[in-house]
């Protein structure tokens, strides 16, 4: 039978007065009183507990006192607190005006981004002027720097054609890539012939951009990549760079597929894709149709809306959940559609009219209800033929205004239905193309973008677009460059020639990249307090930059972008904003503030802080972005302002063990090449000494660093004297003392040789959580700031390498140093030590030998075989145990029964946390034994199906490649298999929830009995003074291993079909782009396409015939 746990008061010293102690404790702990009174079925505990309460308290007090003496002695925390206390008369504590701060940051960002826009505008002007002065020359011969061929030589040592010598030098400004800052180079995808007359004329014309690229870079040295993407397929990039093919020798990068090109070339659009899945579409035709749909989906972005309808005898929404609506074409929805398209099966007879009617109805309903893009609307009809022109449907739904464009894609080589398909497109302001091979799809699909761009081109509206955050892993091969988050500013380039005005010819798009890291430097970290931060989001509510955005995941030894890294919604990071008040205000571009109580995960989610955050936000003018700044209530609302002389501060800056936060911008060092090799500390010194008057520095931050250097300077002498007193023979213990200040200054002192430091990664970039970064203060600083004044927070660190995974190596202890002026308290610094894990254990076991008024051996000791002793931290992680394998693990893993009891008593609380950026393993699919039994015929048919499928696709691509070779292409004869499925990812994006356990500090001691079947297990818990640690002593004689362990494991949040559908259909509020160009009265709608000139090959025709003769179940 369960017994009621006993609680003892920290004020009760009379062990004999047991009931007095219990009621005293209940009076002081109303939570526990409620727990006791709420379950009257539990009998009281009778008899003397086997764990002596007073002895445990003595142990905790002794260990706590010894530990406090050790950490204060070696860290010098009392001295540092005194030095800041002495400086209080010269200090000011200023209350931060969050609204003014976010406005100032926004203005600075707007100024920076405006310079990028001006650079792009100058490129547009130069390109359009060059085109105006250029006459097309079909026989033009022109050599240019081909990015793939530059510096390449043939067997005789001569440069290959288009591959002349091109000087390349490593440049720190461009992530140490080898570039040529004097000129640009030109890249073409493998499927574009590098000597096609259109290419040669375009490349020749765009040579005029070279001096503009250079001039832009000289005017604004913070510019990164500048480029021009041509509508014909070539890509001119500055600075010039050597382009490396992939492992198959293929250049798959096509600038016309990039988000910046597509967004700049067209206005937002609503698209319904209709795909014929009747029996005539079997085999290769269906493969081409699927590839065409995938290519169309790749041209859509987060400002577009889409749905896909498959038709035969009936109309089928390929995602039934999306019936009757359009959904935002974000990455998740596009990928979902691609999976469903891949599963399409052919059967029946194609009835186009009902599919057209359904598409028109959707578009009409969305337009009338003010949903979707409220701009372009289009229907994409993908079929192998149309038996009529469906004029009645168009008369009813689209004429005479023709507000919905219809684009038709005739699949296959048959031309019987070409005239009808073209008629449909031409009479609905669309475009007709015939797609005979997989290779045709890319160029054919791109035509619709050029048609949609016509109104904008004719009107000469140069809209400026900014993309969502993205990583250009396709463009760059180095990990440093490819994993860098960017946004791109882009503008369209038009032909201004009068003779082609009605055709609305888009020449291409110019753009320039802005790294979000550089942009966020304009929100200096030191102005935001210990827990504060700045973040950016887009008009669609997606995160552009946020310290809690985790865009990468680890696959083996490599970091890879998560599939949905650039469509993480603000509500998925600031998930406490359940009413989406903050999100709604920010996407609407409002200026204001909002407050929330939040749970902030720390230490990779193992810990949590409870904070009240004030959010301040405003928009960034002339961009789709909004900026938010977060300040934490309490010490986060204040900023400390000190002052000292340059001479005194400069002297104290020059100590060899002093460093500054390398991620913070004390001085701008990345513009002038002479400054790029300087550390921030070196730059500050050069600035203060006047050696380099050209350096631009943040004078406020430099002033605070000088002040902190002066105040903390005595710590170096203190630590040095301490180190001299440690003999060589003394047993190893404390190895590092350290401090950090709110200005990013870091000092450390070693008490042992560097080779003997227990954790050598500490305070280095390898342990990012332990240093100041752009995103956060060090973990030890953040935790110390939330500890009661004068107390230390302890953390156990363990090895994570392959040699000794999970082995405890070090314990870190830190405490905050505060300053109070005029009743306002601010955190000035944090100070602490790193000690060996073994040293802490030795101190503990020594303290456990203490007992009261007893001569000789103690009656009880933690070394007794009938007792278990643990030291755990305030999140339940074991720092000390007799069993080393339990150290670093959650108490619930080591003793589930005890953790369960502590939770039920309210000593610990379970806090549920959510992760909406998680990656989960796919569920295992187990097949029944019957399913796994194949007949010989079934096995043969399966193999035959696979072989035939692969042969068909290979010969289809071989046929397409042959047609390019007939035109004289000299590119490598390797075709990019874009239709093939990528290797199945082991992990997929998901939502998870996980528990974090938090000690309730009001309960400093507790004891009780746990029922474990045939025995009772007693325990005592005692707070260790001036720390975040707890001592737990339990009775080992009672085996409670039958109790399940309590783990800190993340579990995937599973949504049933109904909830999942509701989530997929839901349209979160968003702000539409400010401009729309859907129609222009001067548009030449008769420029509406023609037939493909790709010729069939004999082997392909024969194999296609075989595909038609074979039963469809063999093919798909």
Swiss-Prot record:
GO terms for cellular component: monoatomic ion channel complex. The chain crosses the membrane at residues 1095-1115. It is found in: Membrane. Glycans are attached at residues 180, 643, 725. The keyword Disulfide bond applies. Residues 1-47 form the signal peptide. A motif (MIDAS-like motif) lies at residues 276-280. Residues 48-1094 are extracellular. The keyword Calcium applies. It is a single-pass type I membrane protein. Residues 270-452 form the VWFA domain. The alpha-2/delta subunit of voltage-dependent calcium channels regulates calcium current density and activation/inactivation kinetics of the calcium channel. Belongs to the calcium channel subunit alpha-2/delta family. This is Voltage-dependent calcium channel subunit alpha-2/delta-4.
